[in-house]
Each structure stands twice: as C-alpha cells, then as structure tokens.
Amino acid sequence: LFPETIDSIRNEFDGLLPQENIRIWYAPELGANNETFIKVSELLREYFLISLNPDWLLLPTLFEPDSDKFIVRPSVANSEFPIEVFVHQITEIKDTQAYKNKATNLQQAKLCFTAIDLPVDKQVQLLGVKVDNIRKLALAPYDLKDKYNSQSIKKIFKDLSAQLLNQEEKTSSLSLTNKPKLAYVSPLPPLQTGVADYSAELLPELEKYYQIDVIVEQDHVSDVWINENCTIHDSQWLAENANEYDHVLYHMGNSHFHLYIIDLLEIIPGITVLHDFYISGLFYQRENTGIPNALNAELYNGRGYKAVKERYAYEDDARIVRENACNTTIIQQSQGIIFHSKYSSQLLQECYVPEMNVESCVIPHLRVKYNSDRESARKQLGIKPDEFIVCSFGLLGETKRNQCLLEAWLASSLSSNKQCKLIFVGKNSEGSYGEKIVRTISRHKVKKQVLITGWTKTEEFRLYLAASDIAVQLRMASRGETSGTVLDAMNYGIPTIVNANGSMAELAKDAVWLLEDEFENSDLVSALETLWQQPEKRQELSRKAKEIITTKHAPEICGKQYRKAIENYPKTRKLGNQTLISNLVPLISNESDKYLLQVARCLSQNQANKKVVKTLFIDITATSRNDLKTGIERVARAILLQLINNPPKGYRIEPVYLAEDEGSWYYRYARNYTLSLLNCPNDWLSDDVIDAQTGDILFAGDLAGGMVVEAEKSGVYCELRNKGVSINFTVFDLLPEQCPEMFPPGANLSYAEWLKVVCKVSDKVVCISKAVADELDVWVDSNSFERVKPLNINWMHLGADLGETAPSKGMPSEAKVVLKKFNQKATLLMVGTIEPRKGHLQTIAAFEMLWQQGFDINLVIVGKEGWQDLPDEQRRTIPKIINKINKHSELNKRLFWLDGISDEYLEKVYSSSTCLIAASEGE
C-alpha cells in the first residue's frame, strides 16, 4: 500500500535481518467504495499472514493517530497463532465504529504491551483485555535498560510459549468424542501397488483419531475393514464437498494408480505422503494418457530449461525419467510433506532452497505384526521342511538388481545343493531385463531351484514371508522410495541382506546384513553362504529385526506420529484459498474488470513463497525481440546458454523480456524464444508475466535502452526491489557519452538517460572490463542519483567461444571459391557491424597504400551495414563507407565484404585468415 517506504525499510534492517525475512503483502488500489477496499484489504492481509504459518504475530501499532487509515486488524478470530499488540496511546478516532472494531480485535491478543500512563484497571476498561494479558512498558531509558531489556522480553515469550504448549498437550489428551473429519486419498486393495496395501494397514490406526472417508478411483475396494469402517467416495465427490473435511491426506506413489491425485491436489490442498521422491514415471504416464506435455511441464517447473533440452537430446525418455525428479508441483501444492525415510528428507534439502515454505517430516513405514506359522505356510506352498529358501520380494526390475542376486546365487555353493531354492516373489519385468533373467535361469538348468512366482495376492505373499529362511532386497538408483518389502521381511524375522542404497543405508547394521551400496558379487556370495551355514547368525539378525519393527514401525507408534503431523501442519483446509475466494466474491462481484484483475494479482503476489528454488531472471529484451547476431546479443546468448546448462546451485534460470500493455510495463517470461533457441518445441508454454519473489535476482545481459527507461517510469524496478529482488545490469561501455560524434544525433542523450536509470535502480552494475568500471565510477561521481545506499560497481571479462553462443548455420554456394582466395595469400580480417567508430575508412586507406606499394594481400570485412533504420543524414559516415566498399576497384579481388554471413561461415573465415585487425575506437 505504501511502496515508496519499502526500500528504506529494507535498508534499515540490512545486516540485522535477512532480506528474505521481510515480506510484502499487496492490496488493490483504493476505489470509490472505501468500505469495500478496507474489507477486501483486511481479508487479503489475514490470509497472507496465515500463509506464512507464523509462530507469533506482533503488531507494533493499533490505536495510533491516523491508524484508522491503515490496515492493522490483527487477524481472523480462528487464527492458529498467538498475537501480541503494542499500544502506545489511545487517541480519539473520528469513526467510532473503527475504534470499536479495533477494540474487538484487540481482545484476540494473547499479550498486550502498553505504554499508556494509566493504572492497569483503567487500561483493562479502555482496551477490553484481560488483566493477565497486559504487560506495561515504561518509556524511560533507565527503566527500559533495567526492567524491560531484551532478556526480560525473551522470558515473556518463553513463558507464553510454555503456557501454549501446556494448553496444547491438555487438548491432545482430551477424549476424542468429536473426531475431526479426514479425507484419505489413496489407491486401495485389490490394486497391485504397495501403497494400497500400506494404506489398508494404516487406516485402522488413523481411525482412532479421525472420522475417515476414503477417496478412490477404482471399481471396488476389497479390504473388509475399510468397507465396514469408512465411507467410500470418488474424486468428484471430494471436489464438490471439500469443505466438509478438516484435513485431506494424499498418498502419492510412482504408478498410474495415483494419476487422479494430481488433479485433486491442484484444487484441494492437503498433506501429501510422498512414497517415491522422484515420481517422474507418474508424469510420464500422465503425458501418455491424454495430458499433452505433462512431463515437459513438470520438467520445466522443477528442473528448468536444461531438463527440457536434455529430453529432446536423448534418444528416448527412459533416461530423462530416471535422472529427474518431477515432484515440484506436488510439493508446491501440498500443505506439508510426509516422508518415510531421512534419505528422502535429505533429497528435499539438496534439491530445493531452505526458504521454500513447505514443512516436512519423517514417519517410518508401519508394519502390522502377523502371527506366522512357518510349518503351515510351507505346507500350503509345497515347500519341504528341510529346504533352504532364499526369497527376493517385490516386482522385478533393473533397479532391484534381481539379475545380480541370481548370478551371485548361481556362483554360490547354494546352487549346487538340491535343497536350496531361490524364489522371486513378484511379477517379472516385461522388458528385456526380465527376458535376460529367464534366459539366465534356462542356461544354467536350475528351473527346479529358481522360481518367479508372478504377482501374488496378499495372503500368498505373506505365506512366502513366513516360509523364507533368508531375504535379499537389493536396490540401485534410489529415487527416495522406501522398501516396504525390507520391512516385511524384518517384520517376519527373516534374516535380510540389503545394500546401502538410498533409505536402506539407514537400517541398523545389527538388524540386517548391510552390504556397501556398490558391492562386489563376491560380497553377496559370501553373505548368502555365511547365513546358510550359520543358523546362530540368522537367529541374531531375526531377533534384532523384530525388535526394531516393534519399537519404531508398530502401527500405534506410526499412527500417533501421523496425528501429530496432521495437526501440526498449517490448518488451512478451512482457511485456504478456496475459502478466501468465497469470502471475497460477495465483496467484489459488482466491481469493474480492472478492479477484479487487481485483486487477482494481489492474490497471486500474497501467496507464501513455495518456489522450490530461487530464480535468476536474465533480461534478454533486445536479444529476444530482434537478435541482430552482433556483439552484445552474442554475449547475451552465450551467458544465457551457459547459465541454462550450469545454473548456480539453488537457482533456476528464467530468460525474460520487457513488454508494454496499455501504458503499463511488465517483465514477461521469454519462453517461446528460449525453447526455440534450444531447438525444442515452443508451442506448449506461454510468455506470462513473471512471478518474482524475495531472494530472486534480475540480471540484464543486453542493452534495451528506451524500454528500460519506460519500464522504470512505470514502476517495474521499484516493485521488484520492494519484493526483495536484487537488480543487476551490464554496462558494456560509455562510448555514446564519450564519443557522441560516433553515434546517431541525440544518442548520447538517450544513452545518458538509460545509464541514469541503471545506476538508480541497480544493486550492482557489472562492466565488461576494469577500464569501463573505472570510467563508470567517475561518471557516477559526477552525476546525482536518488539512492538509499552506494552503487556496487564490478567487472568481468567477456569470453570468445563462438560455438557456445547458439551459432547460426549455413554456407553460401560461393563459399569454397571465396575461402580458396583467402588461403592463397595473406588475409587480414575485420569483424564487426559497419559503423563510424569501427575504423573501416582508415583501414581501407591503409590497404590502398599497401597495394600501391606492391603488397599482394587481402582485406576481408565481415559485418552488416549498421543503422539501416535511420535516414542517411543521421548515419554519420556509414553511407560513405558503404559507397567506398561497393565502388572499390579491388572489390572481390583483394577487398571482400561478407555481409550478414552465418557463424558457421565466419568460423571458416577465421581459420583462413592470417591476422585480425581491431581498428575500433574505444573498443
């Protein structure tokens, strides 16, 4: 509401508070209806504060003079966080209703600091707050030092926190007669996914705390308990009745059974249990089941242009799916994330910035204890009592390293003993990997000793668990998933061999046989033979495994952790965007379209930061509009491509450009241009207005002159700075200022105006050499700017790798003949747009002298004719240069002009040249 004050506030707190911790909220402009403005603004502010999920809310002002003009209402009455208010004085307010509103709102405060020179009982009467909630502050300096110092205030907050925690614990211990309502969204049995079986085991435990409706997209649910204790609905029901629920819990895995959850989560926020960290296979299936570019969009959203580029560079999609996490949308839309391992939580921290406003926790995979009867299980499966059974549980696939186990078993002494069997309890891979396993079994003639069961029902799966002597569960290329089959084996007390891949590295070494992540085949052979030959070792592993399952993975323990996580995450189910919009609609339904757009924009800007990484915006306005393929544009392309291929850790790269709409200027994403530059299809993304947030960086890599000036007048850079975006410009030179005669008339004035804007709005200016940086420093000292703090001027060197600038291709038909002429004699080369300061006339005159003196050498000029959009009278010496070249007697003999050639051709010209002439003035 007061944009002109924000920059000074940020500067005041610089060094005391991270800039990312200064958050800005937005409200529409004050319209004709002041009452509507106040109500809309209060709603926007309240939900902005809720989205931050604060521990405390401190209001430093409420009853001060003119405070009725400000939006300072504490928050909604049902707020989940305590509020403290400072009351410095109470003045008469013209609008008595405004006073009453503030007094009513003050009653929400958990604590009221006052500096009013009145007895406490009088303050209670005036303010309407409880005596216990008032803390009187004296303003005398000595009193502040001795009585109300930082330690004293710290103690107040500490005591209140303890009081609130105690109150929370009392609430938690109350009888759950009115259980909150939970929508549980997950595939369920009989669907062939581990998440379905997991949910069937978890639901009875959650039912102790919640009234549960299950949301599925399947023909029927086979689990008896679920049918008897839960109401079953489909996703359409949830979409239409979401407000009936206190919480929504999503279970997200990597199979097609979870596709319907993606659409639900987009419109109904909830807590997501992420069973597979990557879930890229899910979006690949989404794209192949009727959602065009679903994988492209998720790759772009989460990994940026680099991942999209790689997709079209790879021969197939398998590699891109394997290498890239596609969970960004899920994480951004979730109120909180639950993982089953520390490994997945670690992946979250490694992949995304800590400032991302998403909470996460780790809840171990639960396992229900089953009373297994080994003898009965073996009898039902046809396994003899004296047979030694090694099992690997779960679907077969390359990441499960089943072939590795098979080869180790065949190499071990177990394979030569008829009483030993290897059983893969699961469905074989349908691709070449599964075929390889079958061929290996056939080749070694061990069909009677090695078995692949195919998909087994839950009852049969448990029989194999009860009948096994050893389990081997191997992994590679972990995607953050938790191996439920390892816990199954441990739950049944099966001595289990695993390798330290992903979350399995967290298993206790005395409860499993833990191999290195990348182990030798001989290591696995040794483990198999040792456990076969040493029953006491098997017994010890079995005992410890059961102990860990009982103490860490029991349903009662995990259920309590789920309840704590669900209750502790932001309760925005009934305070979320859907409710906010419902509350806004009656207030603004009769307003103009312009006003509605303002409100919509404020809604977007007020969202708590759920960017998974910060953004480095690269301003390529001039390059994307009319890429002249000349110096500055070539530099801009080269920097852009390098950043796309090697983004700084914690940042995504977003090329942007300035655009004008009805007098207002904005930055838009340069998606169409960038995808074309990367040789990717560009019809699936639009150039939307950018969404910048605190901690982002804008780097202007080319020269957009007048558009930058107009954008500054429109408030573009002020708004970015207010949001906490760092603004950085490149200055290539000061030549229009230093040599105005070398540029079109008036260019020095427009350039000076651009330079003043750059120096006014930038946090840092990057020059292309120390010499330019020194010149700019002098120029800044001789000009005055409205700046809060000094301008940071730095410099860098430019590179010269033509191949990394997205070079243009194409060779004219006469190229071979021309290049042959260059190779026949000494050839000197000039490269650059034909402009007054490039020294063409002087160079041609010098060569005329050399030719007259008998030197048989070539002069090659490569470059377009400059300033062609201007009349000749404004082009200085350019017409004279062009006329000189075109009418020269040596043209195409020993003087060559290659106008607008491709970069591919230019590289060959460089290779055929003897020397480069750099005749430019001020270069």
Each language-model region and where it sits:
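Carbohydrate transferase catalytic cores enriched for Leloir-type hexosyltransferases
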Residues: 1-377, 381-383, 387-405, 410, ...
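A short alpha->beta transition loop at the rim of the catalytic pocket in nucleotide-sugar-dependent
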Residues: 469, 491-493, 914
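Short hydrophobic beta-strand element within catalytic cores of glycosyltransferases
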Residues: 495-498
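Short alpha-helix at the nucleotide-sugar/activated-sugar donor binding site of glycosyltransferases
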Residues: 77, 489-491
